[in-house]
């Protein structure tokens, strides 16, 4: 009986060495997608704790921008951002692409917050984005 148990245990040892996880793909595509909040308005969640400080203390107020201006800038900046993401450039800063539809009416609050994300990345990481206005870009 001891020999049978020993034989079964020896037979099972190789199976315990196999990985239980499925291997990840070389390049996973993560995208930030806008979502609607409880009020039905588009909202953007930024997880960086310094972003709220930046928005309240450093960023220009929302009254300085028009919605059409922000939409135009965001369209260009999202394309530039996604180009960097897809090429693997600035991988330590840009960890996901952005799913943004310029035909969608997101509202000025969303457009403002998205634009300020680009200004914030420029401010914090000194990442040069060509679509930023001269007064918003850190040189």
Predicted segments with their positions:
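Bacterial Sec-dependent N-terminal signal peptides
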Residues: 1-23
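Short beta-strand and adjacent turn/loop elements
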Residues: 23-139
